[in-house]
């Protein structure tokens, strides 16, 4: 999921994907 794109970048997740 690319939901982190607007939330920022949590630990273990990429801001690009």
Curated annotation (Swiss-Prot):
Disulfide bonds: none annotated. It comes from Vespula maculifrons. Belongs to the bradykinin-related peptide family. Glycans are attached at residues 3-4. This is Vespulakinin-1. One of its GO terms (molecular function) is toxin activity. Expressed by the venom gland. One of its GO terms (biological process) is vasodilation. Its main location: secreted. Induces smooth muscle contraction. May target bradykinin receptors (BDKRB). May cause hypotension. It is found in: Secreted. One of its GO terms (cellular component) is extracellular region. Keywords: Bradykinin receptor impairing toxin, G-protein coupled receptor impairing toxin, Glycoprotein, Hypotensive agent, Secreted, Toxin, Vasoactive, Vasodilator.
